[in-house]
Curated annotation (Swiss-Prot):
DEK-C domain location: 13-70
Cellular component terms (Gene Ontology): mediator complex
Chief site of localization: nucleus
Keyword Zinc-finger: no
Subunit structure: Associated with the Mediator complex.
Keywords, alphabetical: Nucleus
Localization (cell): Nucleus
Entry keyword annotation includes Nucleus: yes
SS bonds (residue pairs): none
Name under which the protein is recorded: Mediator-associated protein 3
Species this chain originates from: Arabidopsis thaliana
A Pfam short name: DEK_C
Amino acid sequence: MEEVAREEVEIDKDLRRKIKKTVKKILESSNLYKITEIKAREEASLKLDLDLSQDPYKVIVKEEVENFLEEAVKLIGNKLAMLPKRIESTSI
């Protein structure tokens, strides 16, 4: 049985950093209720003039979107934890 060789695309660190930075800027300026990974990837593709819909670019975008959302959730959780606790009144 023949093995099918998969072509691995190497991405240099500068390009990887540029993709992540572009995606992050897009997410920071977007309504997180409306933006999707696909929309972020398409917008980043236009800004970078690069097809990000194929691996390994697609994986980089997915990871950056996930990282961004995880950080946003942590930030919201931290801010909620700093709010004063609501004091329940008891009736006598």
